[in-house]
Amino acid sequence: MNAYDAYMKEIAQQMRGELTQNGFTSLETSEEVSEYMNQVNADDTTFVVINSTCGCAAGLARPAAVAVATQNEHRPTNTVTVFAGQDKEATATMREFIQQVPSSPSYALFKGRDLVYFMPREFIEGRDINDIAMDLKDAFDENCK
């Protein structure tokens, strides 16, 4: 592994930890994503964070995701994450399930294997964190009862 890849892996591990230390399962291979998505129950809800090393992921996407996923009255059955730019195959496989234009960071909410909500980077970057959290809260309240 070259110095750049080693550095990025170290940084990404800390950023991944912001989610995994709060109950998110990190899916790091294509196989893990496929296995997870193919075994999820039809009535389960899954909140997916497509993580990134960018500033809007650090200052907005991860904090909003953790706050709402851990504190909202209505919460998804499962919370998972893939890391764009780090776990490339896992992210590509998750994006096949999402069926939206690739975007990171971003959020997806599934009911079973059906996408019921998606927030791309353009609705995260430059917004107030409270507005992002309220959008997630509304999606959870509607779909995670």
Swiss-Prot record:
<protein>
    <recommendedName>
        <fullName>Bacilliredoxin SAR1441</fullName>
    </recommendedName>
</protein>
<dbReference type="InterPro" id="IPR009474">
    <property type="entry name" value="BrxB/BrxA"/>
</dbReference>
<dbReference type="Pfam" id="PF06491">
    <property type="entry name" value="Disulph_isomer"/>
</dbReference>
<comment type="similarity">
    <text>Belongs to the bacilliredoxin family.</text>
</comment>
<dbReference type="GO" id="GO:0045454">
    <property type="term" value="P:cell redox homeostasis"/>
</dbReference>
